[in-house]
Amino acid sequence: MIEPWLYLQKRYGESVASPEDADLIKAASELFVESLPGMTEADYSEHGAAHLRLGYDDGPMYVIEISRLGKATWEEWADQDYENEVCPPRSLQVTEQKALTLWKMLKEKRIEDVRKAFA
């Protein structure tokens, strides 16, 4: 069986391969706690989301994007090039804790649980 890969794309551009729970916690906090010195609303808006991707080289790929305003979006792709969408994206409003829970479920490959959360 081919092992999946997992990447966290943090709010300010840092990419983390095989993130630990601590990486997910920090990324969620960066989204919901906007307290960097010198940052303006426009700066925060420009860097408004982070996402976690779980996938296989030959597909499928799953993505949960979380925005700074608490919008979580679930995407399923047949490939890692974002070319063949399996189903339309689904969204819901989340708190920081719920965002973290969703990311952890994806990290643990609990795809059915994630689907249910977005149903």
Residue ranges and their predicted role:
Residues 1-56:
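Negatively charged, low-complexity tracts enriched in Asp/Glu with abundant Ser/Thr
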Residues 2-10, 58-94:
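Intrinsically disordered, low-complexity regulatory segments enriched in Ser/Thr/Pro
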Residues 3-5, 21, 28, 33, ...:
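Generic N-terminal initiation segments characterized by hydrophobic and/or small/turn-forming residues
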Residues 15, 36-38, 83-87, 98:
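Generic preference for well-ordered secondary structure
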Residues 23-25, 48, 69-71, 81-83, ...:
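General N-terminal targeting signals
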Residues 29, 85-118:
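Ampiphathic alpha-helical segments that act as solvent-exposed interaction surfaces
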Residues 33-38, 79-82, 105:
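Short, surface-exposed, polar/charged, turn-prone segments marking secondary-structure boundaries
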